[in-house]
A protein has these predicted regions:
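A short, N-terminal amphipathic alpha-helix
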Residues: 40, 44-45
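Charge-rich, low-complexity amphipathic helices
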Residues: 29-30, 34, 230, 303-310
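Short, surface-exposed, polar/charged, turn-prone segments marking secondary-structure boundaries
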Residues: 33-36, 232-237, 295
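Amphipathic alpha-helical scaffolding segments
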Residues: 21-30, 162-163, 223-229
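Active-site periphery "cap/insert" segments of enzyme catalytic domains
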Residues: 4-7, 46-219, 272-288, 293-294, ...
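Generic structural "secondary-structure junction" signal
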Residues: 14, 21, 214, 262-263, ...
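An N-terminal structural lobe/cap that precedes and organizes the functional/catalytic core
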Residues: 1-39
Length: 310
C-alpha cells in the first residue's frame, strides 16, 4: 500500500493572508494591530521594551531581527534559571507565555486584515478528505499531513470537508495527541482511534509547533481544542475539569496556556502533548512511500525536523 505524507510550512498559508516568519514582527508593530485591546497593548509594549532594553536593538532594526535571536536568549535563561536585564527566570517564563500569545494574535490579525483567497486550501482539504475516507471501505491508512504552522485555516477546512461529506459514522480531524473539547457538549472533537474503532475515519494533522486553537492546563495536562469560532488568545480561561474535580476557583495553577513552539534553537519538546505529536510524526514519516513538501524551507532553527527526516 502506498502512503503519502504532506509536509506544510508557512508558505502554504501565505496566499491566504498568512505570515512567513520575517513578517511577524512587522505585523506586531502595525499601528492597527492592538485595536485598543489592553492585553495586546501591554504585550506589545513589553515586546518592544525587551528588544530595546534587554537585547539593545535599535528601533530602525526591529523588523530585521530574527525571531530565533529573541527567543533563544529567553529560553537559555529559563532553562538555566538565570535573569536577563529586568527579568528574573520566573519573570521570563511569564514574558514568554505573553509573547506566545502575541505571536498567535499577529498571525490571526494578518488573516483578518488581508482576507485573501483561500479556495486552494479548501480544495486541498477536500482532496485529503477524499483519500482519508477510503479507510471506511478497506481499512487502509493512505495519507497524513504534518505542518509547522500555528494557524487553523487548514484545520477548519478539513473539518468542513468532513462535515460536507456527511459521513454516517464518527469522523474527525486527528491531532494525534490527547485532546478535550473546549465546549463540554461538543461531540465532534474525539480521538482519532475512537473514530476508526467506530468504523469511521480520521484525518491525521500533526502540528509540530503547536496550534492557535490548542490550550493546555498546566495541572492535568489536558489540551483543549476548538473549531469554527475564534478564541481570544489573550483572554484568561481555566480548566473546567480541574474546577469540577478539585473544586478549584479561577487560579493560575489551572489557567489554560497557549501551546505554541516559537522559533528558537532551544525548543522545549518535553510537553507531553507535543511529545506525542512528534512521536506520531516520526511513525507517519517512516511509513510513507512519498513525502510532499509544500511551502516549507527547512530553516536552520528547525534542526530537530532534520533529525526527524533522517
Amino acid at each position: 500500500m502506498e502512503k503519502t505524507v504532506y509536509f506544510l510550512g508557512a508558505g502554504f498559508s501565505k496566499e491566504a493572508g498568512g505570515l512567513v516568519q520575517n513578517e511577524i514582527i512587522k505585523t506586531i508593530l502595525d499601528e492597527d494591530f492592538t485595536r485598543d485591546n489592553e492585553r495586546l497593548i501591554k504585550a506589545k509594549n513589553n515586546f518592544i521594551g525587551f528588544l530595546k532594553e534587554e537585547l539593545h536593538i535599535y528601533e530602525d532594526h526591529y523588523c530585521s531581527v530574527q525571531l530565533e535571536d529573541i527567543f533563544t536568549p529567553i529560553d537559555r535563561c529559563v532553562w538555566d534559571g538565570l535573569s536577563i536585564g529586568r527579568y528574573s527566570a520566573r519573570g521570563l517564563v511569564e514574558l514568554r507565555e505573553e509573547f506566545n500569545a502575541l505571536m498567535g494574535a499577529a498571525v490571526n490579525y494578518s488573516f483578518q486584515k488581508n482576507r485573501a483567497c483561500c479556495d486552494y486550501i479548501d480544495e486541498f482539504a477536500e482532496y485529503i478528505n477524499q483519500v482519508a475516507r477510503q479507510r471506511m471501505e478497506d481499512g487502509m491508512d493512505r495519507v497524513a499531513v504534518i505542518t509547522t504552522n500555528w494557524d487553523v485555516m487548514f484545520d477548519h477546512a478539513l473539518k468542513r470537508a468532513i462535515e460536507n461529506g456527511h459521513p454516517e459514522k464518527l469522523s474527525v480531524v486527528d491531532y494525534c495527541c490527547y485532546v478535550s473539547s473546549w465546549e463540554a457538549n461538543d461531540d465532534t472533537i474525539k480521538p482519532g482511534l475512537l473514530a476508526v474503532g467506530y468504523g469511521g475515519y480520521n484525518i491525521k494533522l500533526l502540528k509540530l509547533h503547536g496550534s492557535m486553537n490548542w490550550f493546555q492546563c498546566p495541572m492535568c495536562q489536558r489540551m483543549y481544542v476548538r473549531f469554527g469560532e475564534e478564541i481570544e488568545i489573550m483572554k484568561a480561561a481555566y480548566c473546567r475539569h480541574c474546577r469540577k474535580n478539585y473544586g478549584m476557583s479561577e487560579i493560575n495553577s489551572i489557567k489554560l496556556q497557549s501551546n505554541l513552539l516559537l522559533p528558537t534553537y532551544l525548543k522545549n519538546l518535553s510537553n507531553i502533548q507535543i511529545k506525542l505529536v512528534w512521536q506520531n510524526a516520526a511513525i507517519e514519516l517512516s511509513e510513507a512511500t512519498r513525502i510532499v513538501f509544500i511551502g516549507y524551507s527547512l530553516p536552520s532553527a528547525d534542526f530537530e525536523i532534520r533529525q526527524l527526516l533522517a
